[in-house]
Regions:
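Conserved alpha-helix/loop element of class I SAM-dependent methyltransferases that forms part
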Residues: 64-85
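Conserved class I S-adenosyl-L-methionine
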Residues: 85-94
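Conserved SAM-binding loop of SAM-dependent methyltransferases across substrates and taxa
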Residues: 95-105
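A short glycine-rich, Lys/Arg-flanked "PGG" loop and its adjoining helix->strand segment in the class I
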Residues: 168-187
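A short acidic, Gly/Pro-enriched loop at the edge of an enzyme's catalytic core
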Residues: 142-152
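A short SAM/SAH-binding and catalytic strip from SAM-dependent methyltransferases
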Residues: 151-171
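Conserved SAM-binding strand-loop segment of SAM-dependent methyltransferases
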Residues: 128-139
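Conserved beta-strand signature within the Rossmann-like core of class I S-adenosyl-L-methionine
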Residues: 188-195
Length: 232
């Protein structure tokens, strides 16, 4: 790529934001070695060996370190490594990598997910991360979680799909969901969604994007960030 094109590309808002986040990760690093030292190494190796020959798609998560590195970036991009202790709820928490890092940084954490993948339960136990077992469905409120949260997050989840048709939620479903999250969000709390792309490559319809914006979100492709709570 010619230098002029590289410079032009970097001046684009999306490219600039992503470049700035990468720079910030280098300026304010989060060492993983002390966190890995907190893990029972023998048990971690047992889990890895248990799934080493598995053809299941989720078996890749048994190799812990790459997923900790990915989730370290998520923590850094939300500035939670430079934050006072917060109460964090992660929807679709999977194996708990994101929450494990936050716990080691002094935050109070809770995951919410279905109990369909045994590996995730093993990882959560290894990490000492609490999970509430619950399936998120359209037009159904979340359970009473006993507290409100300063942050509610969700990364690469599929709760906003109807199964088995894999049809995505519309504006009515999302609006109900956001209104319900409001009850679980502490005053001044924040919400972040990292959405999966649909089969056509998009992340949401124009109508859903408009809904996110009307509720106070900053929308950057797959990144939906309500930095000052929800607006109704």
């Amino acid at each position: 790529m010619k230098l002029s094109r590289k410079i032009l590309k970097f001046t684009e808002p999306l490219t600039y934001r992503r470049g700035w986040r990468r720079a910030q990760r280098s300026i304010f690093p989060v060492p993983l070695k002390p966190m890995l030292a907190q893990i029972d190494g023998d048990r971690a190796r047992e889990i890895q060996q248990e799934y080493a020959n598995s053809t299941a798609g989720y078996a890749k998560y048994a190799d812990i370190e790459p997923w900790l590195r990915l989730n370290r970036e998520r923590v850094q991009d939300l500035n939670l490594h430079r934050s006072a202790p917060k109460r964090v709820l992660d929807l679709g928490c999977g194996g708990g990598f994101f929450l494990f890092i936050l716990k080691n940084l002094g935050h109070s954490v809770m995951g919410l997910d279905i109990d369909r993948v045994p590996l995730f339960g093993e990882l959560l136990e290894l990490f000492g991360v609490r999970r509430v077992v619950y399936k998120i469905d359209a037009f159904e409120p979340l359970p009473d979680l006993g507290q409100q949260f300063d942050w509610i997050t969700a990364f690469s989840t599929n709760f906003y799909l109807y199964h088995p048709a894999k049809k995505r939620w519309g504006t009515a479903e999302w609006d109900f969901f956001l209104r319900d999250l409001q009850h679980h969000l502490a005053p001044g709390g924040k919400i972040f969604f990292g959405l999966n792309p649909s089969y056509n490559g998009g992340y949401y319809t124009p109508e859903i994007r408009d809904l996110f914006l009307s509720r106070g979100a900053d929308v950057e492709r797959e990144r939906i960030f309500f930095g000052d709570g929800l607006r109704f």
